[in-house]
From Swiss-Prot:
InterPro entries: aa-tRNA-synth_II/BPL/LPL, Ala-tRNA-lgiase_IIc, Ala-tRNA-ligase_IIc_anticod-bd, Ala-tRNA-synth_IIc_core, Ala-tRNA-synth_IIc_N, Ala-tRNA_ligase, Ala_tRNA_ligase_euk/bac, DHHA1_dom. This is Alanine--tRNA ligase. It catalyses: tRNA(Ala) + L-alanine + ATP = L-alanyl-tRNA(Ala) + AMP + diphosphate. One of its GO terms (biological process) is alanyl-tRNA aminoacylation. Consists of three domains; the N-terminal catalytic domain, the editing domain and the C-terminal C-Ala domain. The editing domain removes incorrectly charged amino acids, while the C-Ala domain, along with tRNA(Ala), serves as a bridge to cooperatively bring together the editing and aminoacylation centers thus stimulating deacylation of misacylated tRNAs. It is an enzyme of class 6 (ligase). Zn(2+) binds at H567, H571, C669, H673. Keywords: Aminoacyl-tRNA synthetase, ATP-binding, Cytoplasm, Ligase, Metal-binding, Nucleotide-binding, Protein biosynthesis, RNA-binding, tRNA-binding, Zinc. Binds 1 zinc ion per subunit. Its main location: cytoplasm. NCBIfam families: alaS.
Length: 880
């Protein structure tokens, strides 16, 4: 067996399958862009679903990839076991209806055992198969020469995730030797059992059935291969180390942590070893996730990152690290992964800034949170309970930023548990935000549909043409082929030549008409068909449309003209955002319509008003410079060398379309654009907002829409100036003057209210009653708010010197209640807080406060008199 680095194993795997005719699929972003069912990309096949379910036909049915992945369903096990990770790489080879079992098994065996590749000793490999998969048994036994005693039949060797492709699988195991297990009485000591000796190297899934919605299984029209090999586990075997953490994929981070902490890994302290592992794992995950656009927050993906960072900081204390340090490990991760993921080093400064910011925030609250938790645990032990209440756990989460998982880990160390149900009840809406994570499900659609069978060519000519003669080459109604569509019917069609742009890259589809003698067809929408053709959604307005009919295809040029202005403006906006906010800004989504543009981008803070103004000014300056927009076809590598921005979630071929706006903006883009920026006219931002963790949104208008917006705003300004009897240019001065007048009137009103309050307080002293020797005043008064009520209370307490006073007022069906007790009566047991709570409860409210002064509110004005009558009862109850 060769001595290889993790990076060499990854590259060797891809090279091997490239030699076998596979296309190398780039590793996709960890943040899914096409699959709303996933929180993270969590497997090698997750990004290929569109191929397996037939929505998209790949150029090459043989695919291989090394896909970065995140799984967070067992975070608490990371560091405790040899192979649990939150971030990992899955190496895979896939066949979309091409080769099947024999090739998959043969190639796997060749890669693992050939001296040209990994070079495993064949005698150390065993396999598992499904009990009924005789074909796999025959291939392994007769062709590969694996003895039948090393071919183990297991019922669980069937891959099934619900609806969609399913089938038997075979797994390959490597025997690491007796040092990892030699007790043959152990029922788990076999390939496929829970043990450290026989490690799974590779899982080959043979997708040959559709699991239908009714629970039945039918053969797939096209059989598929889906395989997965964990790079970290494979590296641990090749490098002959006890755990994945001891490989060169993790040791640089562990080594850097040793330097920072002064502690040593594998120095006989298992708790410290666990801390090293947790830190190494979590910094890999956070580094890659932030690099792909996720940012720490209290919801969804952001909550996962926050939880991982805070868990790592908590474990760092076991290594005597009491300062932010994780950010220092970001460039270490970048160096380890630079061969295949150079973007990590390119973004290291931004990633480190995000990590450091989050660490600093947590350190600010961690000390207080730990102290409070220690008190909670001590109190629970005094009360002889082993449960931390949900209320206390929630207070730690809400006030001190303590993730519930950390509270649970601390509790476990103290031999206690947390009342999870109570915590969840306390979370209410906050819990919904924190847990608003989409489920890590992994499902595919059932294969089928006639559109995937349509191979006929369709040429898009809409970049330079708005109308063209064409022929209907495919016609579909209700999911089935048809020869015609009658007036009033809807359907889908393909043209051999089309000027209609299919929705993609954020740009909406063209609309327009297909015309022929006696036939008028409205084109409502255009999308990409599975094999890449433009698929037109149509309604026949007049006549009958037939397959093979000759038509004139005409797009709505007014609509297209507005769309292209907005699309080119998004390119200018993207670059302006980078110029003003920083190079960390990346497009996270966009929508380009004829009315407006919407641009989503990564940024971990609100865009300030002065920044928005600067961004808007830059875009308009580029418009007014009348810059030519040049579009060219380039080899992908040449385009990247030019500095063209490639966008997350987009797939690019070997030749790409480059859109260049002078020397200012350079992007890979398949959309439609203006010829010169002057055509855009003007650009106006209408809104900026946050739409999720670390993602901001700008909405803007251009051209006619921008003119109409500003014209409306000028109209409103003139109308407002008219109402204020001034000129638009003087309106700010007039507004300032009005504010000053209002402020003066408020001051005069408060002075008058205080005088009236003093007068009314004097009149109220005549209503004082004596109850068991105590002066008691309970009255409904006419004051505007709680402030006036307090002023009156102070006057009454000063005048009466010794009294229990309760005042109530009603404004807009809202009841304000204030209770006061003079100092001499507090010592006798009278308590304003307790009294006001009882009074408020009798008119549908609640409240409380100090012994001398307390306030409350009520919801039922009709019950105020009855509530005030209780004051005498209260005084009597205390005097007893």
């Amino acid at each position: 067996m060769k001595q290889l680095t993790g990076a060499q194993i990854r590259q060797m795997f891809l090279d091997f399958f490239q030699e076998k005719g596979h296309a190398v699929e780039p590793s996709a972003s960890l943040v899914p862009h096409e699959d709303p069912s996933l929180l993270w990309i969590n497997s090698g096949v997750a990004t290929l679903k569109k191929y397996f379910d037939g929505r998209v036909i790949p150029q090459n049915p043989r695919i291989t990839n090394a896909q970065k992945s995140i799984r967070t369903n067992d975070i608490e096990n990371v560091g405790k076991t040899a192979r649990h990770h939150t971030f990992f790489e899955m190496l895979g080879n896939f066949s979309i209806g091409d080769y099947f079992k024999e090739e998959a098994i043969t190639w796997a065996w060749e890669f693992l055992t050939s001296d040209k590749w990994i070079g495993f000793d064949k005698e150390l490999l065993s396999v598992t198969i499904h009990p009924e998969d005789e074909e796999a048994f025959t291939i392994w036994n007769e062709k590969m020469g694996v003895p039948k005693e090393r071919i183990i039949r297991l019922e669980e060797n069937f891959w099934d995730i619900g609806e969609g492709p399913s089938g038997p699988n075979t797994e390959i195991f490597y025997d690491r030797g007796e040092a990892y297990g030699n007790d043959f009485s152990d029922p788990e000591l076999y390939p496929g059992g829970e043990n450290e000796r026989y490690l799974e190297v590779w899982n080959l899934v043979f997708s040959q059935f559709n699991h239908n919605p009714d629970g039945s299984y039918t053969p797939l029209p096209k059989k598929n291969i889906d395989t997965g090999m964990g790079l970290e586990r494979m590296t641990s075997i090749v490098q002959d180390v006890p755990t994945n953490f001891d490989t060169d994929l993790f040791m640089p981070m562990i080594g850097a942590t040793e330097t920072i902490s002064g502690e040593k890994y594998r120095n006989g302290d298992l708790e410290k070893d666990m801390a090293f592992k947790v830190i190494a794992d979590h910094i890999r995950t956070v580094t890659f996730a932030v690099g792909d656009g996720a940012l720490p927050s209290n919801e969804g993906r952001g909550y996962v990152l926050r939880r991982l960072l805070r868990r790592a900081v908590r474990y760092s204390k076991k290594l005597n690290i009491n300062r932010p340090f994780m950010f220092e490990l970001v460039p270490v991760v970048g160096e380890v992964m630079k061969d295949f993921y150079p973007e990590v080093l390119e973004k290291k400064d931004f990633i480190a800034k995000v990590v450091k910011n989050e660490e600093e925030r947590f350190h600010e609250t961690l000390h207080d949170g730990e102290a409070i938790l220690a008190e909670v645990i001590a109190k629970a032990k005094e009360e002889k309970t082993t449960v931390i209440s949900g209320v206390d756990a929630f207070r730690l989460y809400d006030t001190y930023g303590f993730p519930i998982e950390l509270t649970e880990e601390y509790a476990e160390e103290a031999g206690m548990t947390v009342d999870q149900e109570g915590f969840e009840n306390e979370m209410e809406k906050q819990r919904e935000r924190a847990r608003a994570a989409r489920q890590d499900v992994d499902s595919m659609q059932v294969q089928g549909g006639v559109l995937g069978e349509v191979k006929v060519a369709s040429e898009f000519v809409g970049y330079g043409t708005v109308a063209t003669e064409s022929n209907v080459v495919a016609l579909v109604k209700n999911g089935e082929y048809t020869d015609s569509l009658q007036a009033g019917e809807e359907g889908q069609l393909m043209l051999n030549v089309t000027p209609f742009y299919a929705e993609s890259g954020g740009q909406i589809a063209d609309r327009g008409y297909l015309l022929a003698d006696g036939v008028k067809v409205l084109v409502k929408d255009v999308q990409k068909a599975p094999n890449g053709q433009n698929l037109h959604k149509v309604v026949v307005e007049e006549g009958t449309l037939t397959k093979d009919a000759a038509v004139k295809a005409i797009i709505d040029t007014k609509n297209r003209g507005s769309v292209v202005k907005n699309h080119t403006a998004t390119h200018l906006l993207h670059q302006a955002l980078k110029d003003v906010l920083g190079t960390h800004v990346n497009q996270a989504g966009s929508l380009v319509t004829s009315e407006r543009l919407r641009f989503d981008f990564s940024h971990f803070g609100q865009v300030q008003a002065d920044e928005l103004e600067k961004i808007e000014r830059i875009v308009n300056e580029k418009i007014w410079e009348s810059i030519d927009v040049e579009i060219s076809q380039k080899a992908i590598e040449e385009a990247k060398e030019m500095g063209a921005m490639a966008l997350f979630g987009e797939k690019y071929g070997d030749v790409v379309r480059v859109v260049q706006v002078g020397d200012y903006s350079l992007e890979l883009c398949g959309g439609c654009h203006v010829d010169n920026t002057a055509s855009i006219g003007i650009f106006k931002i209408v809104a900026e907002s946050g739409i999720g963790a670390g993602t901001r949104r700008i909405e803007a208008v251009t051209g006619k829409s921008a003119y109409e917006l500003m014209n409306d705003q000028v109209g409103l300004l003139k109308e407002a100036a008219g109402k204020m009897k001034t000129n638009p240019k003087d309106i700010l001065t007039r507004v300032d003057g009005l504010f000053a007048e209002v402020k003066q009137l408020q001051k005069e009103n408060e002075s008058l209210a205080a005088k009236l309050s003093n007068i009314e307080a004097g009149n109220l002293t005549d209503s004082v009653m004596t109850v068991d020797g105590v002066n008691v005043l309970a009255a409904k008064v006419n004051v505007a708010d709680m402030n006036n009520l307090r002023t009156m209370m102070d006057d009454l307490k000063n005048k009466l010197e010794s009294a229990v006073v309760v005042l109530a007022s009603v404004n807009d069906d809202k009841v304000n209640i204030l209770a006061g007790v003079t100092k001499d009566l507090i010592s006798q047991g009278y308590h304003a807080g307790k009294l006001v709570k009882e009074v408020a409860s009798r008119c549908g409210g609640g409240g409380g406060g100090r012994p001398d002064m307390a306030q409350a509110g009520g919801k039922n004005p009709a019950q105020v008199e009855e509530a005030l009558a209780f004051v005498q009862e209260y005084v009597k109850s205390v005097s007893k």
